[in-house]
């Protein structure tokens, strides 16, 4: 077994939305950074080019190659995005995971530079969370509050939004805070018709245009500093820990192509490999000091896994005049309206609805908030390992009665809004999808203000290992119904600002 050491100021695991931002912020602050990416590289130019192509591309399954890929990707090929970019997703045979019998979880993974944000069919919807979300626990009693507020995160949201160039409109909603927009987006005739009808009948329901941007391709900016080293095909296996100092010393990883093992050492370790992957890595990083996983004295590591409840939705014909029908897809958003000013429903939290229109067709897709539960969790399989000998994740997650009740309500409200707008409902998909299918998984290493009940402090720093940070979705306390990526990136920027300050002060 070959071993090699490398030394850096920071070692970042993962090159997706969060890992890319960590690399950018830390290198621009003067740090020498190593990014470990388990997959291959794809040029930034190609990633940007795909967004323009997607406007014209039609989803289709087509070649024998696709069929052969299904043999290696029986799970990955279940997502709508797979036909656009099959090679971006993992090989399920090489990268197995387990679930309880009759309790599936669909874990969609992209291993390449840029992570899932570089997949050609990434949704590109970027919404802020609000204090309505951050303080949900104290309002309804379902889980703790976040240890921060919108005011704490707003400057970091703004950093991300300005750099990405978020497009959208200022709507002035407390539950869906406005971003800093570089460009407004006019409503299509179909969206305006829906907005007028819904808001006239139900003033508490709002229809807004999407908030969108191109993929957050941050690594080129980090590379320009000359302080970034990017290592692809590097499968992280353990976070290295020194029991004498009580600190992480780096990351052990396997070269996916040669099978050789390496160690990368750094003053700081940042995990941004994705919710389940980062947690799996910590669980596997056991020692006499941390027999249940690194940084797990709270016992919360792996618990409170959440993914949005997801319905394939409802389809309708809009009955638009020909001059108002658009060949190009557009989409709008209906933010949460249940349990906002009152809680008269038989379920907690709420859902948002993504509205897609093209031609004379309309598609409503509700995404609901899963209430955190310690029983929904990630552990390590005792029998299954991946191709490189690393124990596979065991994912135990199921929908609750609350999820089912919320989804039933979502189907009913979507139908009534479609009908109010004069649309003809043609198809109702009311089956709740398998957990994981929303591809918005969060939780499992939550932040908090009490080290006894959380894995991380409010700056994404491990309570137990001070130079270890986890900045991806695993830090989430609750999820809200909004897409999580913008919040993940803002939290990463905030954590990096904190890291740099701690390094300068000599505390790290």
Give residue spans per PLM region.
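N-terminal Rossmann-like FAD-binding beta1-loop-alpha1 element of flavoenzymes
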Residues: 10-35
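Conserved redox-cofactor binding core of oxidoreductases
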Residues: 59-91, 96-112, 116-131, 135-240, ...
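A short, basic/flexible loop-to-alpha-helix module at the beginning of a structural domain
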Residues: 1-7
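A conserved FAD-binding loop/helix module that cradles the flavin
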Residues: 478-496
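Glycine-rich loop(s) and the adjacent beta-strand/alpha-helix scaffold that form part
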Residues: 28, 32-58, 62, 238-245, ...
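A glycine-rich dinucleotide-binding beta-alpha-beta segment and adjacent secondary-structure elements
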Residues: 208-215, 231-241, 363-365, 393-394, ...
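FAD cofactor-binding and catalytic pocket of flavoenzymes
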Residues: 86-120, 124-126, 146-150, 298-405, ...
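Residue-level detector of alpha-helix initiation sites
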Residues: 12, 16-17, 189, 276, ...
């Amino acid at each position: 077994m070959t071993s090699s050491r490398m030394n850096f100021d920071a070692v970042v695991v993962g090159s997706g939305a969060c890992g890319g931002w960590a690399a950018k912020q830390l290198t621009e602050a003067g740090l020498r950074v190593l990014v470990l990416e388990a997959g291959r590289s794809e040029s930034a130019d190609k990633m940007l080019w795909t967004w323009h192509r997607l406007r014209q591309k039609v989803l289709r399954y087509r070649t024998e190659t696709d069929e052969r890929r299904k043999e290696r990707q029986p799970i990955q090929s279940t997502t709508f995005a797979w036909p656009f970019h099959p090679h971006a997703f993992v090989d399920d045979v090489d990268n197995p995971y387990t679930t309880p019998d009759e309790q599936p979880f669909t874990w969609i993974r992209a291993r390449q530079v840029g992570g899932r944000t570089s997949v050609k069919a990434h949704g590109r919807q970027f919404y802020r969370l609000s204090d309505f979300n951050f303080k949900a626990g104290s309002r309804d009693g379902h889980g703790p509050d976040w240890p921060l507020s919108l005011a704490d995160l707003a400057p970091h949201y703004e950093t991300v939004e300005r750099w990405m160039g978020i497009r959208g409109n200022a709507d002035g909603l407390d539950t869906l805070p406005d971003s800093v927009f570089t460009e407004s987006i006019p409503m299509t005739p179909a969206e305006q018709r829906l907005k007028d009808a819904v808001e006239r009948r139900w003033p508490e329901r709002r229809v807004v245009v999407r908030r969108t941007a191109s993929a957050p391709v941050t690594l080129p900016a980090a590379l320009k500093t000359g302080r970034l080293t990017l290592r692809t095909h590097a499968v992280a296996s353990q976070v290295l820990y020194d029991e004498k100092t009580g600190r992480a010393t780096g990351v052990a990883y396997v070269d996916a192509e040669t099978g050789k093992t390496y160690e990368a050492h750094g003053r700081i370790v940042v995990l941004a490999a994705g919710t389940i992957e980062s947690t799996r890595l910590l669980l596997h990083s056991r020692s006499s000091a941390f027999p249940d996983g690194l940084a797990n004295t709270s016992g919360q590591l792996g618990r409170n896994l959440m993914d949005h409840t997801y319905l394939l939705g409802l389809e309708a014909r809009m009955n638009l005049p020909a001059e108002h029908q658009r060949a190009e897809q557009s989409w709008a958003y209906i933010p949460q309206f249940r349990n906002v000013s009152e809680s008269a429903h038989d379920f907690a939290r709420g859902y948002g609805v993504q509205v897609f229109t093209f031609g004379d067709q309309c598609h409503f897709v509700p995404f609901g908030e899963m209430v955190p539960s310690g029983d929904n969790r990630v552990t390590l399989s005792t029998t299954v390992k991946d191709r490189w000998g690393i124990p596979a994740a065991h994912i135990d997650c199921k929908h609750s009665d609350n999820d089912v009740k919320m989804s039933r309500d979502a189907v009913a409200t979507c139908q009534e809004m479609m009908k109010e707008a004069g649309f003809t409902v043609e198809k109702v998909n009311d089956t709740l999808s398998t957990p994981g299918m929303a591809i918005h998984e969060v939780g499992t290493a939550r932040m908090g203000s009490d080290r006894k009940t959380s894995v991380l402090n409010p700056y994404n720093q491990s309570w137990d290992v001070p130079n270890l940070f986890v900045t991806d979705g695993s830090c989430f306390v609750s999820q809200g119904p909004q897409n999580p990526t913008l919040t993940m990136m803002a939290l990463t920027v905030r954590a990096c600002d904190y890291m740099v300050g701690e390094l300068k002060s000599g505390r790290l």
